[in-house]
Amino acid sequence: MATRIENKKLSKSSSAWMKEHIDDHYVQKAQKDGYRARAAYKLLEINEKTNLIKKGMTVVDLGSAPGSWSQVAGHLVGEKGILIASDILPMDTLPDVTFIQGDFREPEVFDRIMAEVGDRQVDVVLSDMAPNTAGNSAIDQPRMMYLCELAVDFALATLPEGGALIMKVFQGEGTQELRKQMQADFSKIRSIKPGASRPRSKEIFWIAIK
C-alpha cells in the first residue's frame, strides 16, 4: 500500500528533496531495472571504468542495506564468486548473497564474515556507508570520516596485496589527511564522481589498490 505524504507537513527543503527524488532519472531507472536504489548505477559506472569486480571473485559489501550494491556486485562475481554483505540494519535476502546483520567492528561479526570467506581471499571491499546526515557539515563530516576509517581498517585487515577498496567519501575536512595516511598502505588511490551522483552532492568514491 502506498504511503501518503501530506506536503503541508514537509519543510520546504524536504519538499524540494522529495520532488527531486521522484523526478530523478536514476530513481526511475532503478525502479524499472529492479534495483533497490539508484546507488546501483554508481557502482556499475565505477566498475566499467576500473574492471575491478570480476567473475569468481570474493567481495565484501560493508553497510550493504538496502542492497543495491550487493545486487550489482553479486551479478558481477557470478555463480562461482562469493558476495558477503553486512549491515547493522536488516536487509531483504538476495539470491547468492550471504547477509550478516551486525556491526563488523565486533569480533563475532568479523569472524562470521571471515568464516564465509573461508580459504579464499577477499578480492574487493565495498563501502557505500554514510551517516544519517543532519545537514550540518560540522556534524556530518566527522561522522562520515569515522565510517571511512572503519572501512579502511577492515580493508587493511582482509585484503591481500593487489586487493581493492571501493569507498564512498564526502569531500571536506579530513579527506586529504585520510588519503595521505592511506598512501602508506595502498599503492594507488583514484577518485571517481559517477554520473549517478547528484551534482550538488559532496560524495566521491575512492578506489584504493593495496
Swiss-Prot record:
The keyword Cytoplasm applies. Signal peptide: none annotated. InterPro entries: RNA_methyltr_RlmE (IPR050082), RNA_MeTrfase_FtsJ_dom (IPR002877), rRNA-MeTfrase_E (IPR015507), SAM-dependent_MTases_sf (IPR029063). It holds the Pfam family FtsJ. Keywords: Cytoplasm, Methyltransferase, rRNA processing, S-adenosyl-L-methionine, Transferase. S-adenosyl-L-methionine binds at residues 67, 69, 87, 103, 128. It comes from the Bacteria. Gene3D superfamilies: Vaccinia Virus protein VP39 (3.40.50.150). Its main location: cytoplasm. The active site is at 168 (proton acceptor). It is found in: Cytoplasm. It catalyses: uridine(2552) in 23S rRNA + S-adenosyl-L-methionine = 2'-O-methyluridine(2552) in 23S rRNA + S-adenosyl-L-homocysteine + H(+). Its EC number is 2.1.1.166. GO terms for cellular component: cytoplasm. GO terms for molecular function: rRNA (uridine-2'-O-)-methyltransferase activity. It is an enzyme of class 2 (transferase). PANTHER family: RIBOSOMAL RNA METHYLTRANSFERASE, RRNA METHYLTRANSFERASE 2, MITOCHONDRIAL. Specifically methylates the uridine in position 2552 of 23S rRNA at the 2'-O position of the ribose in the fully assembled 50S ribosomal subunit. Belongs to the class I-like SAM-binding methyltransferase superfamily. RNA methyltransferase RlmE family. This is Ribosomal RNA large subunit methyltransferase E. It comes from Psychrobacter cryohalolentis (strain ATCC BAA-1226 / DSM 17306 / VKM B-2378 / K5).
